[in-house]
């Protein structure tokens, strides 16, 4: 990605008093960005987990990976980065990044490091400080910022690129906002549709599964309290603490006889059949996963074999 250089769009110097922010004025983006929903879900999950661990909202930092063809950039995935704060300045752990880079290149060979992300509001000088560190890894990285605390209905995501502007006679790094589009694959559409369906009818606090489990829990809790009340009455009547009520005892006896007998041969046969079905489903899942692993291994072996064969043929041309 070529670095963009501008001087307020017209070669004029920028007055710091007029533009105290880190945003460049009158600069158009040099690239087009396609953002996948998986990236937004990853960032949101990262922020929620850290907030749950720390007990308060915290800023999170991570890396963006994807593909680039000329001026077209497709941000497809992301992973978390380690950082520490020294004298109120964030420092990225580059050794951790290089380790993660080796790992994701083994899985996503066709993807490359495109930039970084963080959470918060409007970009500030601390973001520029981190962006300069990322610039030491790749040239002109993207910068994505998600605001998880916003109350607006629009997608709270902004994408930026760095530009060099003249501020008070000095070359200064500023940020220029980029427009982006959402790009989805089939698996992402299914996942996003599932998340949307879970919260479409409610306030967003409970999913459909959670509401179903809460209803079942309430029913079982009520049943348990009623059974315990009957049991306490029978024990008290047997101990002579309360008078016998034959009508209540007959209803309790009839209720007990309504329960299925769990020691019959038919129950055992049905129980074993169900256990076998569950075990078979588990085995089928394991076999499917093993077949997928074997398929990936064969594909990699064939690629390696083809490369070695091409190398031998190329060497044969010179001997």
Swiss-Prot record:
The GO biological-process annotations, alphabetized, read as:
protein deneddylation
**Location of this chain's protein in the cell:** Cytoplasm; Nucleus
Main subcellular localisation:
cytoplasm
| Domain MPN span(s) in chain numbering | 33-166
* UniProtKB keywords: Cytoplasm, Nucleus, Signalosome
Q: Which CDD domains match?
A: MPN_CSN6 (cd08063)
Q: Which GO terms describe its molecular function?
A: metallopeptidase activity
Q: What does this protein do?
A: Component of the COP9 signalosome complex (CSN), a complex involved in various cellular and developmental processes. The CSN complex is an essential regulator of the ubiquitin (Ubl) conjugation pathway by mediating the deneddylation of the cullin subunits of E3 ligase complexes, leading to modify the Ubl ligase activity.
Family assignment from sequence similarity = Belongs to the peptidase M67A family. CSN6 subfamily.
Question: What is the official name of this protein in its record?
Answer: COP9 signalosome complex subunit 6
Species per Swiss-Prot/TrEMBL record: Xenopus tropicalis (Western clawed frog)
